Design a protein with these regions (language model features):
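PLP-dependent enzyme catalytic core of the Aspartate aminotransferase-like
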Residues: 106-107, 115, 129, 133, ...
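Conserved PLP-enzyme active-site core in the AAT-like
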Residues: 9, 69-268, 273, 284
Length: 383
């Protein structure tokens, strides 16, 4: 089947028992046992649930992996993956990593002597120079959040394999519709499914897909042991959201390209971060490893413009956390998504106070552009 059909018919399609077209919501915590050690495949919903299992098989199909796992949030998924490591291990991470991922590494896993090395993962030599006997994995976001840096997944995976390391890719911004990290050589893919996969800002979920049986067994053990599983109802909502992923992502892509072109030469804006510009340093890599440029843009306001006033002037675009919904969302990374990252690191990589991150929705693109134009004009200090 082609990808668009797998979105609708992949995983467990419908219900054989009743003939229902959609997978039912198995809203149960426990299951009747036939006898000692004898059951119909389920014992307790933390360990396994038919609705969640349908979702897990679906995301494994979409990412072309060996096993999929559904968690109660993107951070629960990330935490499960980081739980693969032990005291003394180090992980190479990008220098503008999502703030929540940095926080869990810096404030929680560091307590267990699991460390990290911050590098510019777009620079392959810098990655190589930071590999030593303690490094166990290279963690990649591409595009990065929020500066849209592009890392060559295939080349990073080659480095990992030659050093017996894991390659972990957060594929939230791209989704498997645009980019398939496992096919490019990654070992583990993570999604905050709250975002584009769910697509409607009505659920919180995380997904993990792995490329081999050993990792499948390990992640399943961690999932069951730590218990951060996705509920049956949210699993159902996510399956439903995924069905329309292709049509939504096509609209996100086209709208975002138009918005980026609008922002590019505005006098109020100092810089636009968008991997779909040919002058973007990662454009050729992005064009090679993905079939689109996504629905995210970040931009820096010029001096003389107040980001606080800009947010106040927005009307159609919502000022708020998150991304990837049908509605356009704007946020302030320095105080919101990346507030957990130390000020010095934020300044060094470019997460400055005047940086705004925009998740372009699927509204009429002219309405989005007009809203941005009003907000940009309204953000002028004493103007």
């Amino acid at each position: 089947m082609n990808f668009e059909s797998v979105l609708i018919h992949g995983g467990i399609d419908g219900d054989d028992f009743t003939g229902a077209v959609n997978v039912p919501i198995y809203q149960t915590s426990t299951y009747k046992q036939i006898g000692i050690g004898i059951n119909k495949g389920y014992e307790y919903s933390r360990t396994g649930n038919p609705t969640r299992e349908a979702l897990e098989k679906l995301i494994a199909d979409l990412e072309q992996g060996v096993g999929g796992f559904a968690f109660s949030s993107g951070m629960a998924a990330i935490t499960a993956v980081l739980s693969l490591f032990k005291s003394g291990d180090n992980i190479i991470i990008p220098d503008n990593l999502y703030g929540g991922t940095f926080r869990v590494l810096d404030k929680i896993f560091k307590n267990f002597n699991i460390g990290y090395k911050i590098v510019n993962t777009t620079d392959l030599q810098q990655i190589k120079d930071n590999i030593d006997d303690t490094v166990r994995a290279i963690y990649v976001e591409t595009p990065t959040n929020p500066l849209m840096d592009i890392t060559d997944i295939e080349e990073v995976a080659k480095i990992s394999k030659s050093n017996n390391l894991l390659t972990i890719v957060d594929n939230t911004f791209m989704t498997p519709y645009l980019q398939k990290p496992l096919i490019l050589g990654a070992d583990i893919v993570i999604h905050s499914a709250t975002k584009y996969l769910g697509g409607h800002s009505d659920l919180v979920a995380g997904l993990v897909v792995v490329n081999n049986e050993e990792l499948k067994e390990k992640i399943h053990f961690i999932q069951n042991s730590t218990g951060g599983v996705l509920s049956p109802f949210d699993s159902f909502l996510l399956i439903r959201g995924i069905k329309t992923l292709a049509v939504r992502m096509d609209r996100h892509n086209s709208n975002t390209k138009a918005v980026a072109e609008f922002l590019k030469d505005r006098p109020e804006i100092k810089k636009v971060y968008y991997p779909g510009f040919e002058e973007h340093p990662g454009y050729s890599t992005q064009s090679k490893q993905a079939k689109g440029y996504g629905g995210m843009i970040s931009f820096v306001l010029n001096e003389g413009y107040d980001y606080k006033e800009f947010f106040k002037e927005l009307s159609i675009i919502t000022f708020g956390e998150s991304l990837g919904g049908v509605e356009s969302l704007a946020c302030h990374p320095a105080t919101m998504t990346h507030g957990a990252i130390p000020y010095e690191i934020r300044q060094k990589v470019g997460i400055v106070d005047n940086l705004i991150r925009l998740s372009v929705g699927i509204e009429n693109v002219q309405d989005i552009i007009e809203d941005l134009e009003r907000a940009l004009k309204g953000g002028k200090i004493n103007g």
